[in-house]
A protein has these predicted regions:
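A glycine- and charged-residue-rich anion-binding loop/surface
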Residues: 1-879
Length: 879
């Protein structure tokens, strides 16, 4: 246990500040979404975002860096809530060296931080090393002073880090003894035991060898350090609590869950598990959503959906029958916003995403509840004491109803579920799916395999809005289904469709699939490698069954808006070629309803005059009303006609070519208008750089231009009314106001300078002499940080012997500035060190350069004492 029970937020700052004092650059946490790393779904360690630095692909901003990295791991999801060690979301503290310091410094600083900064008892800390790493043993034993019998040697499996060929090396871990009550009671229980007594809190990886892939190791020229320490695990040790769920910031989230659910720790093991699952999963979900992940049926979106639905399901087990996770979001944000201010900025968005997902899941559950009640009534009518496995399987398979909820609800009615029969049916379904895959069917998009017996989907939607087809496959929850009911989200594959799948930058159509007994609402369409169109959506009424005939109908308004934007995209490319030159190649595009984004190669920013001309040319082509002609031609013939292809794209033997009058001829598989006149109004929204040599234009068409125009007109009228003028004279009024504000600001700055000059004279006159230096502390209300800095700079520049701390309070916020004249700095007084002490004394933090440093505090009641300590600081630190 530490000498003081530091909070999670304190420990994070202590770690980062400590390594800053050791010359490390503090980097903010990287996003949970990996950047340019296809090997990871989500960032799962502090080292993961550092890979480009370790591999030499990117030059690090400094050879020493430290981070507190957000991480997600879902491999142990079934253990969440049952153990003290497992959590989906955690923060990983890490210090890294890229060819700078090595074992001596890494081990020494590790020990210093744990014992001197955190105050953990030395006799409860045990280092482990790789069995052959005598160098690490000598450092721990001789330099740190750990007795040999307290240093544990382990083999490659535990204490040697490598991943195939490439850089690798031994590691040294530090374990914390939590005490006998957490042990397994076995006589041989010691470091390395699987029980909860000895908890690994820090791992130092010494990357010093290169593995050639054949078991041969050579020394690396540049040796690196990669360390990791779980912030929550450190807090468990420092706060002397039972588990990750008992540390302060996490427990505060649990308190909110308790307040909503009425369940308390200790009521039962099952309720304790549910409270922990909800706490862990909503914590992870908030950070994932903030970093840009949205619930979906694939990839990291599926991870998020599973976490939210699992948490909602445990809410059901605690008796909550309404969306409640959205009410916990605020507490998660409150506990973490100090270090992650982006959470507060996105609070409304995060809450909305969580609420919508809860509501969608509730609809699934509600539909299953009704069917469960009908099944239950039938069982009771037959005087049965066991709820059949077949019914439980149907609830799960057709309605997406979780089996553990079925078990819970059946028990409430005095019945047990035949789980053996349920598992048998589940196994049979898996066997059927496995046998279907043996047909060597093509690998579907998102890993979905439909088999060779299902033909390619025939797209018939270029010239019609509706058609009739047959349901060939249904997939829900990653498994094939024969039937889906209302509320179930699924993928439906048809033999033919009018709905365009997302391709070539054009978004998918939306619409409906209507069967004899139900309606499936389509919100996305994707085409897999085998040519199947996968219709993503949800059953909104009745049921949809495999093999039944159905009517497919697109949303005609959405299709028309997409056509307007896509046709305008072709006209825009033609205008770019004419205005900017033939070097302009398409580098990417996005076509949405009445909105387009077009990336193109160009060596410089498009000038305002060029942009106006491009917009005018598109509008001219629209007004001309050129007919749209579509042809399917051999690729050689299309190229002979001069059709524009997407640079670097591979095409088949035949291609679809879209011609618009004499202005545009392009390879294209998208949907278009039959005449350019139907594009309607066209307006360029913006032009910007997206990469070196690549520019991007965004534009609106049709109804969106009308909506934007109306909105802008209304805004102009409102602004003119507010400024008591007319829209026509608005610019003149704005110029006058800008000039007036500029003049007033100059006068205000002059008055401030005069006031500051007088204030500084008074401050310097009242300065205290300490060791030959002039020490002064000044406290004022409502001075802006910039003004405080100006005042400090003048004091420092006018008096070389000055040591000053200036404080400004605005509400409960304290802004602090320390400045030191050149003589004071020369005598060992550093503003950065001074501001750290003063800030910490009033509940905050700070830092900076030797002659000027900024900080802040949160406890107004401690400000006077903090300022009173400046004289002692000067006396102590004088050289």
């Amino acid at each position: 246990m530490a000498t003081k029970k530091y909070g999670v937020n304190e420990l994070r700052e202590m770690f980062l500040s400590f390594f800053e004092s050791k010359g490390h650059l503090r980097l903010p946490s990287f996003s949970l979404i990996p950047q340019n790393d296809a090997s990871l779904l989500l960032i799962n360690s502090g080292m993961a975002p550092m890979k480009p630095y370790f591999k030499g692909e990117v030059t690090p901003p400094r050879r020493r860096v430290c981070t507190c990295q957000k991480c997600i791991r879902t491999g142990d999801i079934d253990n969440i809530g049952h153990t003290a060690r497992h959590g989906t979301y955690f923060e990983m503290l890490g210090n890294f060296s890229f060819g700078d310091y090595f074992k001596h410094e890494a081990i020494a600083w590790c020990w210093e931080f744990l014992t001197k900064i955190c105050g953990l008892e030395e006799d409860r800390l045990y280092p482990s090393i790789y069995e052959n790493d005598d160098e690490a043993f000598e450092i721990w034993n001789k330099e740190i002073g750990i007795p040999a019998d307290r240093i544990f040697r382990f083999g490659k499996e535990d204490n040697f880090w490598e991943h195939g060929s490439g850089p690798c090396g031994p590691c040294s871990e530090v374990y914390y003894d939590r005490g006998e009550k957490y042990g397994c009671g076995k006589p041989g229980c010691t470091v390395g035991c699987d029980c909860d007594r000895y908890m690994e809190i820090w791992n130092n990886v010494f990357s010093q060898f290169d593995n050639d892939g054949h078991g041969n190791y050579t020394d690396l020229v540049q040796k690196n350090i990669d360390t990791g320490m779980g912030l929550e695990r450190l807090a468990v040790a420092c706060q002397d609590v039972d588990s990750l769920f008992d540390v302060d910031t996490v427990m505060n989230i649990t308190h909110k869950v308790t307040e909503i659910t009425g369940a308390h720790y200790g009521m039962s093991h099952e309720k304790d598990v549910s409270l922990r699952v909800i706490t862990d999963h909503i914590r992870a979900s908030v950070f994932m959503i903030s970093d840009g992940v949205l619930p979906s049926n694939e990839g990291r979106g599926y991870v998020l959906r599973r976490l939210l639905r699992r948490a909602a399901r445990h809410g059901k087990l605690l008796g909550v029958d309404h969306p409640f996770l959205c009410d916990v979001v605020e507490t998660v944000i409150h506990e973490n916003e100090g270090h992650y201010p982006d959470l507060r900025e996105r609070a409304a968005y995060i809450t909305r995403v969580v609420r919508v997902e809860e509501e969608n899941f509730a609809r699934t559950i509600d539909g299953g509840m009704r069917i469960f009640s009908e099944m239950l009534a039938q069982h009771k009518e037959n005087n049965e004491s066991v709820f059949s496995g077949a019914d439980a399987f149907k609830l799960y398979d057709t309605y997406g109803f979780p089996i553990d909820l079925t078990v819970e609800m059946a028990r409430e009615e005095g019945m047990e579920v035949d789980l053996e029969a349920f598992r048998k049916l589940m196994q049979e379904q898996k066997v059927r799916a496995r046998e279907a895959r043996k047909a060597l069917g093509d690998l579907g998009w998102a890993g979905i395999d439909f088999g060779q017996d299902i033909p390619e989907t025939q797209f018939v939607g270029y010239d019609k809005n509706e058609t009739e087809g047959t349901v060939l496959a249904i997939v829900a929850e990653d498994e094939s289904r024969s039937e889906i009911a209302a509320g179930v989200e699924a993928i439906v594959v048809l033999d033919r469709t009018t709905m365009y799948a997302e391709m070539g930058g054009q978004v998918a159509d939306h619409g409906t699939i209507t069967g004899p007994d139900g309606v499936f609402e389509v919100t996305d369409v994707q085409k897999n490698k085998g040519g199947k169109f996968m219709h993503y959506g949800r059953v909104v009424s009745g049921t949809i069954k495999l093999g039944e005939a159905c009517k497919i109908m697109i949303d005609p308004e959405r299709r028309a808006a997409i056509r307007r934007a896509h046709t305008a995209t072709h006209l825009l490319q033609a205008a770019l070629l004419r205005v900017l030159g033939e070097h302009c190649h398409q580098a990417g595009s996005l076509v949405e309803p009445d909105h387009l984004r077009f990336d193109f190669t160009h060596f410089s920013a498009v000038t305002p005059e060029e942009l106006v001309e491009i917009g005018n040319q598109v509008s001219e082509m629209v007004l001309h009303g050129e007919p749209d002609e579509t042809m399917v031609l051999p690729i050689a013939e299309a190229q002979k006609l001069g059709a524009t292809a997407l640079f670097g794209e591979k095409y088949g033997e035949t291609v679809r070519v879209v011609k618009m009058g004499e202005d545009s001829l392009e390879f294209c598989g998208g949907t278009h208008l039959d005449n350019t006149a139907k594009v309607g109004p066209f307006r360029i929204l913006s032009e910007a750089s997206v990469a070196s040599g690549v520019r991007r234009i965004e534009a609106y068409t049709g109804k969106e231009v009308l909506r934007q125009t109306e909105q802008m007109s209304r805004l102009l009228l409102d602004i003119a009314h507010e400024l008591k003028t007319t829209p026509k004279e608005l610019m003149q009024r704005a110029h006058a106001m800008v000039s007036e504000v500029k003049e007033l600001k100059q006068r205000l700055d002059a008055m401030k300078d005069k006031l500051f000059s007088g204030e500084i004279d008074r401050c310097l006159f009242a300065a205290r002499e300490v060791g030959g230096l002039k020490v002064l502390t000044v406290m004022r209300n409502d001075i802006a940080p910039n003004d405080l800095r100006k005042m400090g700079d003048q004091i420092r520049d006018r008096e070389p012997d000055a040591v000053a701390v200036l404080a400004s309070t605005q509400g409960e916020k304290i802004t602090l500035l320390a400045v030191c004249g050149k003589n004071a700095v020369g005598r060992g007084i550093k503003a950065g060190q001074l501001i750290k002490e003063v800030s910490a004394a009033c509940g905050g933090s700070g830092g900076g350069k030797p002659d000027s440093a900024m900080g802040g505090g949160r406890d107004l009641l401690k400000l006077d004492d903090a300022l009173a300590g400046v004289d002692d600081f000067v006396t102590t630190h004088l050289a």
